[in-house]
Amino acid sequence: MTAVTSDGTPQAAKVRVRFCPSPTGVPHVGMVRTALFNWAYARHTGGTFVLRIEDTDADRDSEESYLALLDALRWLGLNWDEGPEVGGPYGPYRQSQRTDIYREVVAKLLATGEAYYAFSTPEEVENRHLAAGRNPKLGYDNFDRDLTDAQFSAYLAEGRKPVVRLRMPDEDISWDDLVRGTTTFAVGTVPDYVLTRASGDPLYTLVNPCDDALMKITHVLRGEDLLSSTPRQVALYQALIRIGMAERIPEFGHFPSVLGEGTKKLSKREPQSNLFAHRDRGFIPEGLLNYLALLGWAIADDHDLFSLDEMVAAFDVVDVNSNPARFDQKKADAVNAEHIRMLDSEDFAGRLRDYFTTHGYHIALDPANYEAGFVAAAQLVQTRIVVLGDAWDLLKFLNDDEYSIDSKAAAKELDADAGPVLDVACAVLDSLVDWTTASIEDVLKVALIEGLGLKPRKVFGPIRVAATGALVSPPLFESLELLGRARSLQRLSAARARVTSA
């Protein structure tokens, strides 16, 4: 659908998109994908990204969820140009603060005949359908469109409180969806719908398109679960244009569903849906956003990895695929791992330090050289992890209170053959003056491989298990340097005693 002015002529405008979540529960990855696509399109076109909070449901909305939404967007780097805590020319940007605006709009719709009061109860609607031989579940039958004054007064006298319904047009409603192509709802398939409850409280069906119109939104880009509401909203835009409260009908694009297991939409009950669960595991924003972008869009056929800047340069909503996309945790993990590897070492160390601090992790390093030691430790694991949380399992051996020798590792490596290896290792390391990775590697290779004539696997396996407690660890010689001379020798000696006692 081409954007039009009030006189029906095409009008070009700077792109204005909006992301308008409801503050309920925790942020869902499907919702984040919608925010990302809107943000990327605004940045690609040089437009404006508006954040609007749809908090008109007092029973479900919460301040905690509202703050979680802001936290999520900030962590991901999806900054908004207008909205809460930023301001803008069309505020306020929380719908709970716009009640007077909605009352004014409804009053004008009623005064011009675009909307009307409706008194029919659901039971009355069903009975009328039955009497006419129709399916009683067809929904509202537009009965109250043309009530006489006498009928209106009689209903009021009964104490009935009416809802307000929009008068739907007597013609098909079509639009050129930017993702799905031409979409049409035939006349009669969408009945006159409710704008306000009998209490006067506005519904989503009113406030969403009303705010889009008043905030001059040019593109409504959202999930396909809202597709069925679009003909209602198009009709309301048309009415708002006629009463002089809107300039245009925005363009629409409906993104494909994000699926979980099987063919079902990814449910909030599934752990993969929870944005913060991914953050807690140690996803970095670049990795998660890259993967979410792949749920319906691709930068090119031959590669899946890209930066946010590269996405902005390439993203166009018309390139979004209309087919449902399945959330694949293994694929998401793989993408995140690649982005971790692409970070420079200082950046990675800083992020890992922040992650450890948030989760109460602390690795024991030389206090006099802690920062350099942490960077060195981070470098050892950067190419070996999928999420930041994996680093703790690899580095916690540096803490004496976390260190213990795994029983399976001991059974495999600390057998009788390990005794001579550990004896020689303790001797040469105890006399080593230069406690550096290169020196540690040199003396151990000379003494054990050349001196004892053993293969590397036979000599370094016992030392690795003795020093780290595990079969898999960061590089051995670097790990010994980080442990320091005293703790390394203490652990190797304790492991040697374990071999003897066995």
Curated annotation (Swiss-Prot):
Where does this chain carry the motif 'HIGH' region?
A: 21-31
| Highest taxon of the lineage | Bacteria
What keywords is this UniProt entry annotated with? Aminoacyl-tRNA synthetase, ATP-binding, Cytoplasm, Ligase, Nucleotide-binding, Protein biosynthesis
InterPro entries per record: aa-tRNA-synth_I_cd-bd, aa-tRNA-synth_I_codon-bd_sub2, aa_tRNA-synth_I_cd-bd_sf, Glu-tRNA-ligase_bac/mito, Glu-tRNA-synth_I_codon-bd_sub1, Glu/Gln-tRNA-synth, Glu/Gln-tRNA-synth_Ib_cat-dom, Glu_tRNA_lig_a-bdl
Q: What class of enzyme is it?
A: ligase
Q: Which Pfam families match?
A: Anticodon_2 (PF19269), tRNA-synt_1c (PF00749)
What sections of the sequence does the record tag as coiled-coil?
none
This chain's protein is named: Glutamate--tRNA ligase
Species of origin reads Mycobacterium leprae (strain TN)
